[in-house]
Amino acid sequence: MQTPNRSTIRAVVFDLDGTLLDTIADLASAVNYALATHGRPVRTDGEIRSFLGNGIRRLVAEAVPEGTTASDYEAIFATFRTYYVAHCMEQTKPYEGIMPLVRHLKQDGVKMGIVSNKLQPAVTQLHEKFFAGLIDVAVGERPGIPRKPDPKSLLTAIDNLGATPETTLYVGDSEVDIATARAAGCRCVTVLWGFRDEDFLRSRYPDAHYIHRPDELLTLDFNTL
């Protein structure tokens, strides 16, 4: 199968958590380790899933109990960050169909990148473990690169790939990803196997383009996006 309308797309940039990788188990373990270490009640996977999408500082801020002081929050966040960077690959895995999709795009000559609100060290580890030799660029949160929906991380990846926003497709799983793509001037596809409920997304972005399986990306007419 050939990628449709290949000439209109030079690059595909993916979100990481909830799009390429199912990271919820490792994130939940790190959040709950940090909470328990500091004597706070732990959260369910469902609660943690609902907190995702705006970076790890926001994730931890949502997870701590109401009334937590700023200094206590910083201590909990520091514990989370240290634990997660050390344990971010224990249960994380690609979603079904992701590896065949990425290999197909690579074989078809499409340049690929990752843009994530995850800290750069964890993004680098996961990129190297799962996508080395397949995906060319991986941009995470670091000094000078603000979190999505600020488009700078996506624009940085696009520039590093030698593409332009007009010739890039961005693929994500959340309202944050849709907003990021629109701010950057990219075409966007939103996946429905990730961390957001389909009804939630469609009610807020009825005009967005959605897919249920990775292989659907290969059958899209990119000119209609």
Regions found by a protein language model. Give the residues of each.
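Short, acidic loop-to-helix structural element flanking the phosphoryl-transfer center
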Residues: 86-114, 120-126, 151
